[in-house]
Amino acid sequence: MTRLFGAYVIVDYSAAEGKKTGESSVWIGVMKRDVRFRLSYEAHNPATRAEAQALLKTLLADLHKRGDRIFLGLGFPLGFPRGTAAALKLSGAAPWRQMLDFVSKEVKDKPTNENNRFQVGAKMNRLMTGEAFPFWGAPARDAQTMLSVKRAREHGPGDLPEFRLSEEAIKGPSSIWKLYYQGSVGGQALTGMPIVSRIRTAHGERARIWPFETGWKPLAPADLDGVDALFAEVYPSLFAPKASAGQVKDEVQVRAVCERFNALDEKGQLGALFGPAKDDPRRDAVESEEGWILGVSP
């Protein structure tokens, strides 16, 4: 049975400020075949997002030279809730592309891990609603008129959704509008999306971002003809067992996801995770703006 991928790279991400390793930092797991075609695994724990970006570029280039088609699983959102691009009055490309370009242009992340995500969140609030909403969460020193320390109010009728459709399906991840505190998905998205844009550009046109450029549907090997790397959003906690005493949770999770996807691919079952076989009323929102978390059942 033909596999979809020859190698798996899984990233558990962090929006931490300052150099950080260990718990709640960036972990990158890599599963590939060695020269004797035996399965091998390695883990990396770069101290900054800049180091992670450089490492990912190197890893993808090396795997590409080997002739492996690469699955790159990223532990942060690649899209925003439906309607976000329109609320920002962006136009031209597809909404997901508009948002990727907007965030990549606005967010500045220094080699020291210092970044301007709170300023960007405040700017987006001003452009979308003119109030400290929907983005929320910041240290007191970074709070401002358009970004509050705590959530300003609940989402109501007429507001942008608090959660994307895939998040509603599992009710696990925090909202992308949360920029600070534990599980700050918004901080991870704002600092992670520019890296996705740069890595994709470095890897060339033979890279694709799922489901925006592949469709939200089951994938077969023929669907990936001409594709060297597929980028997708993953939620490492979805598959991973609890860490034992002395283990780093994030490290355990990236390995578990690598092993899970490899096992499914070996059985010819991984392709079914990439979307529903039948038509779905959510398809347009998923494919055009929100994306989907791989492994979450439609």
PLM-predicted stretches and their roles:
Residues 2-7, 13-71, 76-298:
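RNase H-like (RuvC/DEDD) metal-dependent nuclease/polynucleotide-processing core
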